[in-house]
Amino acid sequence: MKQYEYFAANYRTDKKRLKRQFAHDMVALLENENASIQDMRLGRKALKAQYKADKKALKKESKRLEKSFRKDFGMLRRPIMADIFDFFEEDRAVPNGKTPFNDEIKIEKDIVYKTVDGKQLVMDVYYPSRPIAGKAPCVMDIPGGGWMIHNRLRRDGYARCFAAMGAVVAVIDHRLCPEVFFPRDLEDCVDAYNFLCDNAERFGIDKDNITVTGDSSGGHLTMCLGIAATDPEYANSLGIPTTQTKPAGLICVSGAFSFEVMYRIPLTNTLIVRYVSGQKSRKAFRNWQFYKQSDPYNYLNSNLPPCYNSGGMTDFLCMGEAKRMSDALTKAGVKNEYTVGKNLFRSDHCYVLRFPFAPARKDALALYNWYFRLEKDLGVDMSKGFKRVETFMMQYKKALKGEIEC
């Protein structure tokens, strides 16, 4: 059971116990043959009043115990933003996952890559239906969700398009805030990457050709993983392992890179940032042990692989981060490209993952085109697979109806 669920579960159990006791006492009162009608009325009224008072006292005591426990162990409540993310992500999951490749691409689900504190961390692996010659390139996807939620199935369409191009795609889980704080989530991502390297033969991949991608908080972890892979001192300062190989590329979709930037935005400050580090104020955050390391801007280096950043003009969670990161990468001597969506209504947070909308497909195609060119530079021909994805993106409705072949 997750820490934030413990007290709620116990409260529900105790409330059910009270209800059963109330029902038992009411039955006993009604079955008492010696009680008069007046006694029954008074008894029923007294039992109801006692039941109501006991429920109120139970709720108060449960909250008191939870507050005391969280204070002693430095825990934070599961933030309301996590529930908001859950609601919207679940609503978008089905339409975003519709592609003409759904029936042909095989998925190996729930592959355990790590067990920590009794919890199994897993990944889903997508295999291309039309493999390219030789070992396949690999794409490792870190789903976003404010570092607080993630669901591998919600990146299904995004992953299938990479697989349709000819890549083996691994969509991973990692531990979440506020149960753990940075850099434990980054450590899980590095371990997932190394698991793919250790099992390259099993998955049929080239461990020297793994591209890492992530959206929102996953974009942040993607960039931090790239830094850990190219700067051993950074990994050592966090107490995490480095990657066995250098990633071939990094793709960040609406990457939430800088907590300093997010602290300036009231929405992200109140609902997200404090839960990532466990620090409730900006002053406390700046004194946090991993304050400097949590911001990838502080550690960009010329050894980073080629990078691609996608952002939206109306992204109020990570406004301007795609261009800001691109400028910083260029200054550090890193080959990179970026795209910022300009559509007033369809350029919000992680909009490129929403394939039903034409502006999203246009910029998603630019992302897949960048990956196609990256692999071409590495000597991998994905032209046939990219053509299939291009046809799908440009003729979306006809492709889904089967009127044209992808």
Regions flagged by a language model, labelled:
Residues 4-7, 11-29, 33, 40, ...:
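Amphipathic alpha-helical coiled-coil/heptad-repeat segments
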Residues 45, 52, 64-406:
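Alpha/beta-hydrolase superfamily serine-hydrolase fold, recognizing
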